[in-house]
């Protein structure tokens, strides 16, 4: 997966062959969290990503959208409450191409990065709440004199 996320998608015209079942199986080993599915006779890879908060899913979908624009390879993105489902396939060949697995790897990387950012933000917020709990403000807040109101 590490090498896939560093690759760039190549332009894909209708004369490029779909991946064979053996090629799909080999690439799928690099993206084990992704499910290979067939929808309306077209193979695709899909994964549902979970989030603690709805806005984090929106951020993720936006980041994947930007990656898709940069690579000129676009997924189907379904945003649900605290979940985002991505479906990758190559429309011009009505099936799977290496580009789909490249974008799966890039999507996974974007997800892990967002989880790290969210975790770091939560740690800072928890530390702040421990230092100044909302129910126990510092004594100087609300004091009318220069002394602590304790």
Language-model-derived ranges and their functions:
Residues 1-119:
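Long, contiguous binding/interaction regions
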Residues 40, 113-150:
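A charge-rich, low-complexity, intrinsically flexible signal that marks solvent-exposed coils, linkers
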């Amino acid at each position: 997966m590490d090498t896939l996320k560093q690759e760039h998608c190549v332009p894909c015209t209708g004369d490029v062959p779909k991946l064979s079942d053996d090629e799909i199986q080999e690439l799928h080993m690099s993206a084990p969290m992704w499910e290979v599915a067939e929808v309306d006779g077209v193979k695709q890879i899909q994964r549902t990503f979970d989030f603690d908060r709805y806005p984090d899913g929106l951020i993720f979908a936006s980041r994947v959208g930007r990656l898709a624009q940069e690579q000129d390879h676009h997924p189907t993105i379904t945003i649900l409450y605290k979940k985002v489902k991505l479906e990758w396939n190559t429309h011009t060949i009505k099936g799977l191409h290496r580009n789909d697995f490249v974008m799966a790897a890039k999507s996974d990387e974007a997800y892990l990065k967002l989880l790290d950012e969210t975790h770091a933000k939560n740690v800072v917020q928890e530390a702040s709440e421990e230092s100044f709990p909302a129910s126990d403000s510092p004594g100087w807040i609300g004091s009318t004199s220069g002394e602590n109101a304790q």
